[in-house]
Amino acid sequence: MSQIVVCAMYKFVTLEDFEAMRQPLLDTMIKNNVKGTLLLANEGINGTVAGTRESIDNLLAYLKADPRLVDIDYKESYHQEMPFYRSKVKLKKEIVTLGIDEIDPNKICGKYVEPKDWNDLISDPETVLIDTRNEYEIEIGTFKNAINPHTENFREFPQYVDENLDPKKHKKVAMFCTGGIRCEKSTALLKAKGFDEVYHLKGGILKYLEEVPKEKSMWQGECFVFDSRVAVNHDLEKGNYDQCFACRMPITEDDKKRPEYVKGISCHHCYDKVTEKQKARFAEREKQSQLAAEKGFSHVGDEAKKLAQLNKQKKQQAKEAARKKAQQ
């Protein structure tokens, strides 16, 4: 397979007709064989998709034809295989869920910082540097001296701010995330709470890794991504992590050697949290996945749907043939 372009994109912009946008956008993705998920809400668009160079260019051209999305923010990386199984466009209340209705980055947010200027900002001893991502993402990589809020999801971030940050004490706050969307919304939250100097990394970690040379980089480790690559290294190539299919946590080759790890069923992160009923279900899923692989099919996604439909048609044809034979 030729090299696949993985494109992460977002823009905070008022889309009053976001519901009507869904089907034409999905049709465009399917027509161009672009897979992945895009989220639409009144506050904007967000998602990561993948396809050939031509396919991604066609999708971006379609989006930019809308004057509201002409400057949509996007980052690209590359992979040898398609990292997604389906084409989806979902309607949401928020394109990234903070859970506070009055926070609107379209009205107020912090100051963008270009990747080339990021090192100077976070090297300033007056700067409080906060990683706005989840615990499991931070575990495999973050910026030097960044604070880990220890959140399980983005909805927990406002509580962290209320309990740990003070606009009178923390005069200069810089935040970052994978592609820029969570840290942008985080700056809107802090501005609403009275913080003055609030900054966020434009384009997120992915843009930083793309533009800042390794020898000057202050990034440590790998960057978690929400697709089958699991993580990317500083060259934006697939990293050294795999993923537990039970809990979706990143795992290393050493983690796979631990007694709690059973492929497709459990790992040391979730072994004590997964019920026997769930383990049985995961075991069956893994079995079906292996059978599909042996036949040269994917167990999930559009290919799996086609296989299921084909099997259904064969069964119906067999039943019809048996019925006709019985009537003879």
From Swiss-Prot:
Catalyzes oxygen-dependent 5-hydroxyuridine (ho5U) modification at position 34 in tRNAs. The keyword Oxidoreductase applies. It comes from the Bacteria. InterPro entries: Rhodanese-like_dom, Rhodanese-like_dom_sf, TrhO, TRHO_N. This is tRNA uridine(34) hydroxylase. It is an enzyme of class 1 (oxidoreductase). The keyword Lyase does not apply. Residues 123-217 form the Rhodanese domain. Residues 304-328 are annotated as: Disordered. SUPFAM superfamilies: Rhodanese/Cell cycle control phosphatase. The active site is at C177 (cysteine persulfide intermediate). Belongs to the TrhO family. Its EC number is 1.14.-.-. GO terms for molecular function: oxidoreductase activity, acting on paired donors, with incorporation or reduction of molecular oxygen.
